[in-house]
Structures are given as structure tokens and as C-alpha cells.
């Protein structure tokens, strides 16, 4: 367990995690009283550029190590959201700041350092499998810290490039043998001894099949059934070495004893990846040393999102296979599609329902003809009809039910031209499901099951019976309408329309409503003429009078 590290005097603490370096970062308020003795402090990296470095006491980062709820949450996803952290604190009575600090310390121990884009993309990948723990093997690193100090001497502190903290490593007194991962100060007297109960709890967590983590017992049973050795399980598929691995290998080149009787600290293996892992791993001196190298690659192997059990490993592109071990890219393997186009397609993250919809094949002409022929007779199929249609067409029942629903919707809104052209005479345009009409589907479906599935179109209407009736009677009687409709294969309304078209056109009669006004207008000119004649006669009389006076 990383208890803390002692920064050399005179050096400025800086962060080199892909963010901007900060110069001379003072400790926070909690650490202000311990500035004279910085051995018990630990520097936690920020998550974004806006956050400052977090200095906290190393003892606070290990208070919650025995909380199974936090361990399970970290095993599911090492970057929980604020909502998840708040829910944990509310449900189990924890303090928000301590929980956030604990998660940052766990990520630092496991060497997980992702950018914000990688966090969001990886969260989107694992959101479809909420019932599985995708990172259940990461915390097995920290469980080695519960062993007594005499079993695990302090290994060398990594260089600044590996941990991401820009502080030079302290000088090493002598190379030591490493059985597990434990980073301690050089003087054991500075650190208080762990309680015995805490050590026993740690040891019980590390034993395979212990009751604290039941999912690990299933994992070891799967290892025994698959036939892989624990050493092969400790190195996982496509184990890669990061940029700063050379310094780790240089400091841990002392021969180490075989530790096959102990479980490996990390198990990066999936059930369907055993052939690839057996052929792609590189031989190592022991399972502990190989897992120690995996932890040394802080941003490579430990930061990879573990593939869930049952997954299929992606094939490595030739450009990545050609890279030497110390130049392999240091980002999670599942997120390399940004640099390798076409590596990870969007179809890998689709839900099973969406993938099933994409695999739906188009219906053939024969299948559509069978469905349309049945729909012309009955728009609401029964369970037996669906079974028959499923046998005849070969289509799955959900597709048949969906086709009937879509076709009924289109018919209700007047969008089915083929239904209007081929509708059965006398049948309603849209059948109400509440009206129980005996569908003629049982007999026809039984016949189609024995004969070829090609339907027979209905015969065209025949007008000759109507013409013979018109030539004989020249008039339509109401009692003869059903017989004529059956003989001509026309509906009752169509028969009536045909006879109406045969009737002679009635004579046009023009009715003028203004006749009285026209008569009055004709009388008025006659009166005017009579008045003019009377005036002329009066004028003649006046002339005669004048002549008489002369």
C-alpha cells in the first residue's frame, strides 16, 4: 500500500500527468500543520486542469480500504461520477471528501491516469453491462500491503515518468527482492504498525475464494477449468510495457523466487481470450514480477479497461505490432480507435435489441404476397393465423406482428393503394377488431400449407350480367340488386352507379325568376309612346289656334 513518499528538500512539486505543471504547490489546510514533517503526506493528482494538486495525509487514504461498497464501486469503474459518490455517502454514512480522496488514492496506486475524454468513452462502453465488475482485478495490488513488513521489503520508488509526479526518487540503499507490491518509506520506524485485525483482513482478501469477494472465487474456478497456470493468468493478454518500464526493469533485475503457490496480484484474462493470451505473453521470472511490471506501466496495462468475461479480443493492427515494447502507445486499448481509424466500430456498443433490428432482412416478394393476400381477407390475425403464416413464410412472429400493425396503421390513414385496388367487394375498408367476424383464414392457410405459397388474385368484375338485365328490363328493381351484385362481382353501390349511368339524361328546364320584372319593363315603353302621341296632338291644336287669329 502506498503510505506516502518523502519529497526531497529544495524540489518543487509538479504534476506531469498530461496537465499543465504547477510550480511550488503548497500543501492544503490539512497539511499546513505538518509542513515540518512531510513524510506522512501524499500528493493526489487532479482530474482536470482547473483543479489544483491535492495534498492529504497518507493515513486518510487507507481508512476506507476495508469498505466493501467502495471496493465494489471502484472495481466496477475507477472514475465514479459525483452522483455515484454522493449516493454512496448518503447510503452508507460516509464523508464526501474522504471518499473522493480515497478514489484518487486508489487510482494512483493502480497507475490509472486517464483523460476526461477517455473517462467518458470508457463509461459509455461499460454502461451496457452494469451487472459485471469490469475492473475487479485492479484492487488486488493494494491487498499485498496487509502483509508483515519483514515479508515484503520496500521496493524502489518509481521514477517521475511512471507515477506522474515530478519529484525525483530517493536514493536506494541496496537492491531487494520483491514478493508483492508495497511502497513504504525507507525507515520503517517512521510508519506506525498496522493493527493485527487490519492485516488479517487484508490477508483474507488476498486468498482465493475468500468470503469477502465472492466473485474472485468464481474467477479462480474458471482458471482451474480453463487449464491456465496462475503465472499465465497474472500476465494477461497483450501485456505491454510502457515508456518508463526500463527504469523499473533496471531496479528489479535481482533474481526472485518462484511464487506459484500464491495467487497473482492482477488477473487480466477473459474466458474467450485464453488462446491469444497463451501465445502473446512474454516469459517472466515469476507471476509476481510480471504483475509488478504491469503496475509499473501506469498508463498502459493498469489503465486498460478490462474486457468483460466472454468478450472477443480485438486484433492488433500491423502498425501497432511493429512497435518496440518501450514505444507502445500508453492509452487504454479500447480507446485506440481515435488513432487507428476503423478499429472500433459503433456496432460494438449497440444493445442486443438494436443489433437484432439491424440484422432484420427484407421480405421477399413471395412473403409479401402471402401477407398481403391474408390482409385482404382479414386485417386482425389470430394466434393460429400467426403460427400458420410463420410456417408458410419462414418469417419470425415478431416481424409478422409488426408488419400487420404497420399495415393497419397505413390502411387507417388511407396510404394503402394496393389494398384499394384489390379489396374484396362488399368488404369494409377497415375492419374493427371489436366486431368478431369469422375470418376465412383457416381454410386458406391450410390449403397454402399444402400448395405453393403463391396467392391467386381475385377475378375482375363482370359487367355482362348487368348489360343483359338492362337490355331485357330497361329498369332496375330493388329485389334484383343482390343477385346482380353477386353475378357481376360488384358491390351494391357500384351496381346502382352503373344503372344510373345508363338512364337517359333528363331535359334541361330553365326557370327564370325575373319574368314579372321583364313584363313591367315591356309595359312601361307603351305608356311612354301614348303620352308622346297626346303631346303631339296638343301641339297641332295650338298651331291651328294661331292660324285662326291671323
Curated annotation (Swiss-Prot):
DNA-binding found in the keyword field: yes
Bias kind Pro residues: ranges: 1-10, 452-463
Compositionally biased region (Polar residues): 237-256
GO biological process, one term: regulation of transcription by RNA polymerase II
Localization (cell): Nucleus
Tissue: Ubiquitous. Strongly expressed in adult testis and kidney as well as fetal lung and kidney.
Cross-link (Glycyl lysine isopeptide (Lys-Gly) (interchain with G-Cter in SUMO2)): 182, 200, 202
The name this protein goes by in its record: Homeobox and leucine zipper protein Homez
Amino acid at each position: 500500500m502506498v503510505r506516502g513518499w518523502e519529497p526531497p528538500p529544495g524540489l518543487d512539486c509538479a504534476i506531469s500527468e498530461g496537465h499543465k505543471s504547477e510550480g511550488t504547490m503548497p500543501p492544503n489546510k490539512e497539511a499546513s500543520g505538518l509542513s515540518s514533517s512531510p513524510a506522512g503526506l501524499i500528493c493526489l493528482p487532479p482530474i482536470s486542469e482547473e483543479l489544483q494538486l491535492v495534498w492529504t495525509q497518507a493515513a486518510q487514504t487507507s481508512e476506507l480500504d476495508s469498505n466493501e461498497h467502495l471496493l465494489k464501486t471502484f472495481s466496477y469503474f475507477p472514475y465514479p461520477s459525483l452522483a455515484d459518490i454522493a449516493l454512496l455517502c448518503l447510503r452508507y454514512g460516509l464523508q464526501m471528501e474522504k471518499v473522493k480522496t480515497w478514489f484518487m488514492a486508489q487510482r494512483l496506486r493502480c497507475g490509472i491516469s486517464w483523460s476526461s475524454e477517455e473517462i467518458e468513452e470508457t463509461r459509455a462502453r461499460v454502461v451496457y453491462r452494469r451487472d459485471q465488475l469490469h475492473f475487479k482485478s485492479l484492487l488486488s495490488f493494494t491487498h499485498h500491503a496487509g502483509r508483515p513488513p519483514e515479508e515484503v521489503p520496500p521496493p524502489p520508488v518509481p521514477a517521475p515518468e511512471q507515477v506522474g509526479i515530478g519529484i525525483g526518487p530517493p536514493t536506494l540503499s541496496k537492491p531487494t527482492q520483491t514478493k508483492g507490491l508495497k511502497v513504504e518509506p525507507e525507515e520503517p520506524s517512521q510508519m506506525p504498525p498496522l493493527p493485527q485485525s487490519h492485516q488479517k483482513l487484508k490477508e483474507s482478501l488476498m486468498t482465493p475464494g475468500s468470503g469477502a469477494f465472492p466473485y474472485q472465487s468464481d474467477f479462480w474456478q474458471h482458471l482451474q477449468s480453463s487449464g491456465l497456470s496462475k503465472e499465465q493468468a497474472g500476465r494477461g493478454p497483450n501485456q505491454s510495457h510502457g515508456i518508463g518500464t526500463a527504469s523499473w526493469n533496471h531496479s528489479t533485475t535481482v533474481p526472485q523466487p518462484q511464487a506459484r503457490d500464491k495467487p497473482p496480484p492482477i488477473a487480466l484474462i477473459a474466458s474467450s481470450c485464453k488462446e491469444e493470451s497463451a501465445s502473446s505473453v512474454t516469459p517472466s521470472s515469476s507471476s509476481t514480477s510480471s504483475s509488478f511490471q504491469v503496475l509499473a506501466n501506469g498508463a498502459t496495462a493498469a489503465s486498460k479497461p478490462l474486457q468483460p468475461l466472454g468478450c472477443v479480443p480485438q486484433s492488433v493492427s500491423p502498425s501497432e505490432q511493429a512497435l518496440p515494447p518501450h514505444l507502445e502507445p500508453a492509452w487504454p486499448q479500447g480507446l485506440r480507435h481515435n488513432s487507428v481509424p476503423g478499429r472500433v466500430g459503433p456496432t460494438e456498443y449497440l444493445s442486443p435489441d438494436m443489433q437484432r433490428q439491424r440484422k432484420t432482412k427484407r421480405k421477399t416478394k413471395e412473403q409479401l404476397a402471402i401477407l398481403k393476400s391474408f390482409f385482404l381477407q382479414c386485417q386482425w390475425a389470430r394466434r393460429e393465423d400467426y403460427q400458420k403464416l410463420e410456417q408458410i413464410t419462414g418469417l419470425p412472429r415478431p416481424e409478422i406482428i409488426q408488419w400487420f400493425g404497420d399495415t393497419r396503421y397505413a390502411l387507417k390513414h388511407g396510404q394503402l393503394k394496393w389494398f384499394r385496388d384489390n379489396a374484396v367487394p362488399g368488404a369494409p375498408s377497415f375492419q374493427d377488431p371489436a366486431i368478431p367476424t369469422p375470418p376465412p383464414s383457416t381454410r386458406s392457410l391450410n390449403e397454402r400449407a399444402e400448395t405453393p405459397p403463391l396467392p391467386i388474385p381475385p377475378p375482375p368484375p363482370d359487367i355482362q350480367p348487368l348489360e343483359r338485365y338492362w337490355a331485357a328490363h330497361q329498369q332496375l328493381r330493388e329485389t334484383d340488386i343482390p343477385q346482380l351484385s353477386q353475378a357481376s362481382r360488384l358491390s351494391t353501390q357500384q351496381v346502382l352507379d352503373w344503372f344510373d349511368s345508363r338512364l337517359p339524361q333528363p331535359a334541361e328546364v330553365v326557370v327564370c325568376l325575373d319574368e314579372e320584372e321583364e313584363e313591367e319593363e315591356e309595359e312601361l315603353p307603351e305608356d311612354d309612346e301614348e303620352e308622346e302621341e297626346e303631346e303631339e296632338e296638343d301641339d297641332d291644336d295650338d298651331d291651328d289656334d294661331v292660324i285662326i287669329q291671323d
